[in-house]
Curated annotation (Swiss-Prot):
Domain MGS-like: 930-1070
This protein's encoding gene: carB
Residues annotated as binding ATP 2: 707, 746, 748, 752, 777-780, 820, 832
Note describing how the cofactor binds: Binds 4 Mg(2+) or Mn(2+) ions per subunit.
Protein name: Carbamoyl phosphate synthase large chain
Record-listed E.C. numbers: 6.3.4.16, 6.3.5.5
Protein's organism: Listeria innocua serovar 6a (strain ATCC BAA-680 / CLIP 11262)
Functional note: Large subunit of the glutamine-dependent carbamoyl phosphate synthetase (CPSase). CPSase catalyzes the formation of carbamoyl phosphate from the ammonia moiety of glutamine, carbonate, and phosphate donated by ATP, constituting the first step of 2 biosynthetic pathways, one leading to arginine and/or urea and the other to pyrimidine nucleotides.
Region (Carboxyphosphate synthetic domain): 1-401
GO MF, one example: carbamoyl-phosphate synthase (ammonia) activity
A biological process term (GO) from this entry: glutamine metabolic process
Chain residue ranges for the region called Carbamoyl phosphate synthetic domain: 547-929
Domain notes: The large subunit is composed of 2 ATP-grasp domains that are involved in binding the 2 ATP molecules needed for carbamoyl phosphate synthesis. The N-terminal ATP-grasp domain (referred to as the carboxyphosphate synthetic component) catalyzes the ATP-dependent phosphorylation of hydrogencarbonate to carboxyphosphate and the subsequent nucleophilic attack by ammonia to form a carbamate intermediate.
């Protein structure tokens, strides 16, 4: 069936900011789709609010709109661009929900726009819990006994009939938002209330819990001719009850018999055909381990996180082909880009095993509830490929970057019996390590199976790994056992620990017996057909399939799994660096392990190695490829941390030298450099003990900013106001010693400014200066950034340009650098210099049209800025105003304090642009999910230090018609200033308290700067959490509140009566 020629323009809806449940996989899918549609000759219009994505690059579509994905803005784009069709199935839950909203509002009919891929009826049947259940009943496919509920009373009725436990699944939500397993009435009340609030149609499915069944997923494709095929089947190691995004997953499934596999395959194909989906679809099934009984859990009628994993696991580009199917092409017409000879309807065959392990942010959120359930909590994931499950699993473990290079975690090994039991029976993010610890202590696989319902096959494989550990320890330097351990995925570092020698000695032993990995190709067909994909994984076998080319090559290290502090921004820079290397005439090679990202799409680089980012794994690739050098600037802290080990092994680090990187990152060396350059910084010193830290703080005066050296995302950073708080920080937050010093600085509460620059060693280009709306003390990644800076004098700007130029040349930076300053009056202090790409680089690249990672890479390869056509100094500022607004995932992470400080908490970002700051901010807030009410009630409860400032804010809120509510202390201050205020009771007082007002929806905005404590029992913590749980915007910085207020003021009108007697009264605005 030829592609459709009755449509010319297609609107692709992106997925918006990165949040838990919807990460970089949709940048990968959207990028593939846009390129695929352009390849077929269609005019592509894209809307997405996330500037940190490749898909929002100008080259990806004919028209790119970085605008809020809301009904209002998408409708405007449709009316302006007049597309013939929209493709919403590549924008995750955001894209699907937007399509449903556009349809319900009549926009699609009004503008005569067709929905491609999956029609709205199919979306409704899959997403609406009631319609889905009805369809399964029609097909005769079993679903767990369930009921659709719209309120708590209906939930009670269902539980009375079925009994506990029950699973709550809200309709039209992402990553299981608001859902969970309920074992008692208290859990039922909490989960159902939260689920109904988060569901856009106020609907939840309550179903009988089938926790303990095997969870299996099928990734399927179908075209308009009703051809359907399975791309990949995947098995969750964790049984039903844990969200698939939080589960360890293996592909292909390992424990299904052929009969079970075919049974579930047939069901999946039957469902995609019944829904008449044209494109990709994910079917989740539950299989009774003791019979052939199964249940259909749910269907995602779109490209998903699992599609990205299936694409990378098989090499089969699902999103690219789904876009082609959406425009009428069929599976038997489209060639498989991997083989170039077979067609897309051939089902991929794997002759290897793939392991996926989720990456969580609990290192950032120590207070978070780590218990896993049906609501997703992981921020990212890693994937590894091996010839056996054991090998793939161990490679995935060391890809996680959690300080473990094996199934060995200190906390698990040192845990008492009670903790060990709890961690095994009630799964948390680190259960895998506790299972290994239990096996080391002699628990049997049968005992562990009874407690966890994890299949005996996986537990047996774990026990074999532990057995091999013991044999290693008993036979030091035994060549046969060394070879066996390497085949099973053991790292040199772990073997060295077993044998009590250093890692280099293991490498030397392997070298002596020529024990090195070979690289195998991912080809979708188990080598049945000729394939030319440059996509490889390592394993300890005989035949090597990766042949070094005659062309000079450069290796770029990726940034690994997405986590808070190191997000998709670094993948963006990695991809641009690869493109620049190719433009400069070299072969570009990527090493990375994140299945969600664009960088691990094999068509991006000349060669892709899907490997852990450890010294050992990276060195093996370097030894086989013999590159000109390695680029570490774009892979975040992951890549920077490898530079030292690589250099010691004789590898050339391209760009800024290791010594100069250390001068920027090592506190004492940095201070010396600043002294020579005569650039001021806030007073401070390095401390290597608790006593030293107290002395430094006493000398410079409180408050002080404390943080460990060499961190990303403000890990363990805090503003400390007293000696007692400092002692608590030093003993709880960090392990201070001479090897890991702590920096203690005077805290300057000024205006924070951020600069990204590129240096070729002589010339320095500054694309832009960004100012932060929140004052210093809030992590730059959590601040609203504004470009061009609005509040800086010309003198301050000139100083910043001067300091940036001097720092770049003085530190011998070659490539990119990011500098953070604090401005106090007309004084400028440098806070820190990062000699690498930053999380603001994609934002600044988009708005200044200077492709920073591309230019920096050309400079790293030896070109200079002037020859590349750039004038040194600050680039001319744009007329429009751009803002970068952070996006948080607090709703997914219960028990986490939402207050902002020096440690980063946001998972993603959006951009707003317009002709005024207020309009740009409005777009940014709306795109980030902040509800902007033009009137309502503001709850103010602020610390004493903020009361004076709060009075001014309250006056302005009152003037535009908002009601002010405040707790006793704040209310008294406002009354003294003659501002109308309703006093509300604090938590714990009798009668209705402020928490009741928040829960009852009587508050539209909360401004809370009350307590800095992290303990959940603190009032401020409870106020902030309740606000998040109830979808109410909460500002923990008066600067953010002022920004929202500016927007609201700009949207209000003057209202003044004509009575002469009232003319002298202050003007009211609404």
């Amino acid at each position: 069936m030829p592609k459709r020629d009755d449509i010319k323009t297609i609107l692709v809806i992106g997925s918006g900011p990165i949040v838990i449940g919807q990460a970089a996989e949709f940048d990968y899918a959207g990028t593939q789709a846009c390129l695929s549609l352009k390849e077929e000759g269609y005019r592509v219009v894209l809307v997405n609010s996330n500037p940190a994505t490749i898909m929002t690059d100008a080259e990806m579509a004919d028209k790119v709109y970085i605008e809020p994905i809301t009904l209002d803005f998408v409708s405007r784009i449709i009316r302006k661009e007049r597309p013939d069709a929209i493709l919403p199935t590549l924008g995750g839950q955001t894209g699907l929900n937007m399509a449903m909203e556009l349809s319900a509002a009549g926009i699609l009919d009004e503008c005569n726009v067709e929905v491609l891929g999956t029609d709205l009826t199919a979306i409704k049947k899959a997403e609406d819990r009631e319609a889905f259940r009805d369809l399964m009943n029609e097909l005769g496919e079993p679903v767990p006994e369930s009921d659709i509920i719209h309120n708590l009373d209906e939930a009670y009725t269902f539980v009375e009939r079925i009994g506990y436990p029950v699973i709550v699944r809200p309709a039209y939500t992402l990553g299981g938002s608001g859902g969970g397993i309920c074992h008692n009435e208290q859990e039922l009340i909490e989960t159902v209330t939260s689920g109904l609030k988060l569901s856009p149609v106020t609907q939840c499915l309550l179903e009988k819990s089938i926790a303990g069944f095997k969870e299996v997923e099928y990734e399927v494709m179908r075209d308009a001719n009703n051809n359907a095929m399975v791309v990949c089947n995947m098995e969750n190691i964790d049984p039903v009850g844990i969200h698939t995004g939080d589960s360890i997953v293996v592909a292909p499934s390992q424990t299904l018999s052929d009969r079970e596999y075919q049974l579930l395959r047939d069901v999946s194909l039957k469902i995609i055909r019944a829904l008449e989906i044209e494109g990709g679809c994910n079917v989740q099934l539950a299989l009774d381990p003791d019979s052939y009984n199964y249940y259909v859990i749910e269907v995602n009628p779109r490209v998903s996180r699992s599609s990205a994993l299936a694409s990378k696991a098989t090499g089969y580009p699902i999103a690219k082909l789904a876009a082609k199917i959406a425009v009428g092409l069929t599976l038997d017409e489209v060639r498989n880009p991997v083989t170039g000879t077979t067609y897309a309807h051939f089902e991929p065959t794997l002759d290897y095993v793939v392991a996926k392990i989720p990456r969580f942010a609990f290192d950032k959120f120590e207070q978070a509830d780590r218990r896993l359930g049906t609501q997703m909590k992981a921020t990212g994931e890693v994937m590894a490929i091996g010839r056996s499950w054991e090998e793939a699993l161990l490679k995935a473990v060391r890809s996680l970057e959690i300080g473990a290079d094996h199934l060995l975690l200190e906390e698990a090994e040192n845990a008492d019996a009670e903790t060990l039991e709890r961690k095994i029976c009630f799964p948390e993010d680190d259960r895998l390590f506790f299972l290994a610890a239990a096996l080391r202590r002699g628990q049997t696989i049968e005992q562990l199976h009874a407690k966890t319902k994890i299949d005996l096959f996986f537990l047996y494989k774990l026990s074999k790994t532990i057995e091999l550990e013991n044999r290693l320890k008993e036979n030091p330097q035994n060549e046969e056992i060394l070879a066996e351990a390497k085949r099973a995925g053991f790292s040199d570092a772990f073997i060295a620990t077993c044998w009590n020698i250093d890692e280099q000695a293991i490498y030397d032993l392997r070298k002596a017996q020529n024990l090195f990995p070979v690289y195998k190709m991912v080809d979708t067909c188990a080598a049945e057909f000729e394939s030319t994909t440059p996509y490889f994984y390592s394993t300890y076998e005989d035949e090597n399939e990766s042949i070094r080319s005659s062309k000079e090559s450069v290796i770029v290290l990726g940034s690994g799994p997405i986590r808070i502090g190191q997000g998709v921004e670094f993948d963006y820079a990695t991809v641009h660096s690869v493109w620049a290397i190719q433009q400069a005439g070299y072969e570009a090679i990527i090493i990375n392990n994140n299945p969600e990202t664009v960088s691990t799409d094999f068509s991006i680089s000349d060669k892709l190695y899907f490997e852990p980012l450890t010294l050992e794994d990276v060195m093996h690739v370097i030894e086989i490829e013999q590159p000109l050098g390695v680029v570490v600037q774009f892979g975040g802290q992951t890549a920077i941390n490898l530079a030292d080990g690589l250099a010691k092994r004789g590898v050339k680090i391209l760009g800024t030298s290791l010594e100069d990187t250390d001068r920027a990152e090592n506190r004492d060396a940095f201070e010396k450099a600043l002294e020579i350059l005569q650039i001021p910084q806030p007073a401070g010193k390095t401390a290597t003990s608790v006593e030293a830290a107290i002395k430094v703080a006493t000398d410079i005066g409180y408050p002080v900013l404390v943080r460990p050296s060499y961190v990303l995302g403000g890990r363990a950073m805090e503003i400390v106001e007293s000696e007692e708080a400092l002692k608590h920080y030093m003993t709880n937050a960090v392990k201070v010693n001479p090897k890991h010093p702590v920096l203690v600085d005077r805290y300057v509460s000024g205006q924070e400014v951020e600069v990204d620059a590129i240096s070729d060693g002589e010339n320095v280009l500054i694309p832009g200066i960004m100012e932060h709306i929140e004052r210093a003390g809030v992590h730059s990644g959590d601040s609203i950034a504004v470009y061009p800076a609005q509040r800086l004098s010309e003198q301050v700007k000139n100083t910043i340009v001067d300091y940036t130029t001097r720092l770049a040349t003085g530190l011998n930076i070659i490539g990119m650098l990011n500098i953070q300053y604090v401005v106090d009056g007309e004084e400028v202090f440098v806070i820190e210099v990062n000699p690498r790409s930053s999380r603001t680089a994609p934002f600044l690249s988009k708005i200044t049209e200077i492709p920073m990672a591309n230019v920096a890479t050309r400079v790293i390869l030896g070109e200079n800025l002037i020859d590349l056509g750039y004038t040194p100094g600050l680039a001319p500022e744009k007329q429009e105003i751009f803002v970068k607004v952070p996006v948080f995932s607090f709703a997914k992470l219960r028990s986490v304090d939402t207050s902002l400080g020096p440690e980063m908490k946001s998972t993603g970002e959006v951009m707003g642009k317009d002709v005024t700051l207020e309009k740009a901010l409005y777009k940014g807030f709306v795109a980030s999910g902040t509800t902007m009410h033009d009137y309502g009630t503001v709850l103010l409860t602020v610390a004493d230090r903020d009361k004076e400032e709060a009075v001014e804010l309250a006056k302005r809120f009152n003037r535009i018609g908002f009601t002010i509510m405040a707790t006793k202390g704040t209310a008294s201050t406002l009354e003294e200033a003659e501002i109308p205020v309703s006093q509300v009771k604090k938590i714990g007082e009798n009668q209705e308290t402020l928490i009741d007002y928040i829960r009852n929806g009587q508050v539209t905005l909360v401004v809370n700067t009350l307590t800095t404590g992290k303990r959940p029992e603190r009032d401020g913590f409870q106020i902030r959490r309740e606000s998040v749980e109830n979808g109410i915007p909460v500002c923990t910085s008066l600067d953010t509140a002022e920004a929202i207020l500016r927007v609201l003021e700009s949207r209000s009108f003057e209202l003044e009566s004509m009575n002469a007697s009232e003319v002298k009264q202050p003007k009211a605005r609404v």
